[in-house]
Amino acid sequence: MQPTDVKNPDYFHKVVDCQWACPAHTPVPEYIRLIAAGRYSDAYMVNWESNVFPGILGRTCDRPCEPACRRSRVEEENNPKPEPVAICRLKRVAADYKDDIRGRLPKKGKSNGKKIACVGAGPASLTVARDLAPLGYQVTIFDQDPRAGGMIWSQIPRFRLPLEVIDEEVGYILDIGVEFKGGVKIDSMKKLMTEGYDALFIGSGAPRGRDLDLPGRKEGAKNIHIGIDWLSSVSFGHTSKIGKRVIVLGGGNTAMDCCRTSKRLGGEDVKVIVRSGFEEMKASPWEKEDAQHEGIPILNYLVPKKFVVESGKLTGMVFEKVKAVHENGRRDLVPTGEPDQHFDCDDVLVAVGQENAFPWIERDAGIAFDKSNMPVVDKVTMQSSAPNVFFGGDAAFGPKNIIWAVAHGHDAAVSIDKLLNGEDIAERPAPGVSLMSQKMGIHEWSYDNEIHADMRYKVPWRDIKITLKNVKAEVELGFDVATAWKEAQRCLNCDVQTVFTDRLCIECDACVDICPMDCITFTGNADEKELRNHLNAPAKNLTQDLYVSGPLKTGRVMVKDEDVCLHCGLCAERCPTGAWDMQKFLLEMTNAGPGCRSHRQKKAA
């Protein structure tokens, strides 16, 4: 193998598994260290710079960082149920215990004369506004709802996300000088294009829930509701009750929100019915656990066949029992041949997916759409076929989640800023990277001189007798300070990297002897496949890179499997020549502003 290019910003970034997995690339170990030190406001600001909504995401994020967490991998053989660090809930700690941080937020920049319109007031549009307003852009956000936040406030129940948390963090953005026009529905793209805006950002979400065209649908329409519309109606205060017997159709997070909300609005016999298996459900594992904790059964492998309507009233549903069959590399659901199953109900909530809807974008407005009736959008720049029109969030590529919408907003803001400064938006400067040597001995970066197989600490819940009676009573109470400190110490500080200097190595193999995970090997060079199988501990995880040195004095190379390294620093402490060094990796993502335009400025200079 060729020596590893550690100057490539992606190399050490990828080693910080949580940050690499986060669409907004939040520096997770950095803010966890700040929480452990009691510096909650600093931890909040580290989050705010990258993910914009720490308090909101600390309660609702889909947590792509946690399945990637190294803690789970290194404990697989020592712990019956290895669990990642509670990254998401520690984010909430920063939000819960911060001081007043308004003085640390950016102010509206001096006007540069450029106007930006954002359609939809969800997380993608708000991120665009957050990034551009301090640069002097006049940003106006339009939304048909009277309150900013989009699906954050209209579709996520208050028992998961209190309104005051939304208002606080949305308010931080609007207070930068962003104009919000609530209750204004944009019904013509061509008209908007004539209103003097230099760039348009479309963050209108995926506002249409999928329906089920089954026998009995029209006859029982009064008691058959589209899930996201029903949740919005609850948020608006238009809906405050539901029948005692409720069936929720669907296996995603919206279905989990629907069933739990139903339980609080009068539903006594509430069940979720899904066509797939339990493990294949799209809902996050913790969302399913939360529903089951509240006594809501999830019934799998049942395909809806018809709504049962008697004397004009919905009375139940009929389902066909299916099973999963794997043939020729495909997975299909086939009938089992068992009798159909009937379930009584008073109401049905249909939460089987969401779709985009762009009836307001005329097809002769210069914006290309694909065969699926989705806008053609560049996945890097977020630009449509109309040069000054950008898309993000669910409006760009279909339903995803809040943290992806934030990432899209950052990318679109960079593109808008470059476009309106006369630059090629496809030229994206690489992130800034710095590596700083850390003190040895009593570590600056680790919490303990030993790595313990510590179990994940559980977030306390409010008494279920209270929460099931009040749709606004927040269920999770968040970590207290003491528990947050203990959970923070489970972090392995993967951003403190093991950096190897070939010329200093005397090949004493002391680092090999002391490594607790056997992830360092000195061996003859070979291709990657052969090296992976001939290390002290075979490197079987192909998603994790090998760190390979240049040729050493004996002709051998140092090979380190990044997969299970604990970042404990023992190799660096033991090395007599300083060939190993522990260096803290800091990644600065390229955001809108002078940094994203630096390439052109340097060439001009």
Residue ranges with predicted function:
Residues W20, A24-K107, Y172-L174, G182, ...:
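Glycine/serine-rich phosphate-binding loop and adjoining beta1-alpha1 elements at the start
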Residues C258, A395-G422:
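A conserved FAD-binding loop/helix module that cradles the flavin
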Residues V93-K110, E168-G183, S188, G209-L265, ...:
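Glycine-rich dinucleotide-binding loop and its adjacent helix/turn
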